[in-house]
Amino acid sequence: MCDEQDLARWAKGKLSRRAFGGSAMAAGVAACTPIDSTGDMPEASGGLSEGMVSFAAPGGTMDGFFVHPSGTRSPLVLFWPDIAGLRDSKRQMARRLAGEGYAVFVANPYYRDVAGQQFEDFADFAGNGGWDKARQWRSKLDAEAIQADARAATGWLDTQDGVDRSRGIGTQGYCMGGPFTVWSTAAVPRMKAAASFHGGGLVRDDATSPHRMLREDAHYLIAIARNDDAKEPEAKVTFREAAEALGAEAEVEVYAADHGWCVPDSPSYDEAEAERAWARLLATYAEAL
């Protein structure tokens, strides 16, 4: 999981705003048009409908970016971003997944404190006090809060025309969003797949540790950064053993890349390993949803 030392190093090195890689941005760039909570969404490029949405949730008014194939119903995916929150790189990732046939909601995890996008990209987050701001917002996001948010989000999204309610739901998360996927799956019975990419805190010493909240009928894709694994090499073993004891299907793997490798605006982005992880995500959803 990224920490203050990482952010200080990236900021001191004048982290550049990297151009998005071609394959990661294959869905193309479309404008993010704000819309109201009725779900009336404008047409975007590539046969997708997209926009910002908002709805009532336990912590106030939850908002996020919703994109789905136009004119059809698709399996729902709840997308939890990393510590830098909702921003263009996450919208682009959501568009790419929607292009594969999914209705994708990128949550603003900090809606209890702020609405919408707070940072332009990871460089903006790392260089302009993002850690100090996000640390306060993130402190409210325990298992109980995330589970309440997951229930609220999926409940509202299930009322939207673009969502196929007969299919299972997937959830994916990055960095701090990794454990959110397991908590969400524990809270929403129709969630059938949880994918964590360079997620932190998947094994903890409390009752709400994600490895203690697995479901027998769900699929788990746990993609671990090599530098995170070096800090906690036993965590992958503990998670895998917990899944095996329950009989849950879990793919747990350490990738040959550092924390943040899946996110195009991260200083650790590794296109080859990101594409490999993306392929495993699609395979997991194809099997489970």
Describe the predicted segments one by one.
Residues 15-30:
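N-terminal export leaders
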Residues 249-289:
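C-terminal catalytic histidine-bearing segment of alpha/beta-hydrolase fold enzymes
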Residues 38-69:
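N-terminal cap/lid segment of alpha/beta-hydrolase-fold proteins
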Residues 151-210:
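Primarily recognizes the serine-hydrolase "nucleophile elbow" in alpha/beta-hydrolase
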Residues 1-15:
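N-terminal secretory signal peptides
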Residues 200-254:
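The feature captures the conserved acid-bearing segment of alpha/beta-hydrolase catalytic domains
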Residues 74-82:
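Short beta-strand element of the alpha/beta-hydrolase
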Residues 122-170:
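Gly/Ser-rich "nucleophile elbow"/oxyanion-hole loop immediately N-terminal to the catalytic nucleophile
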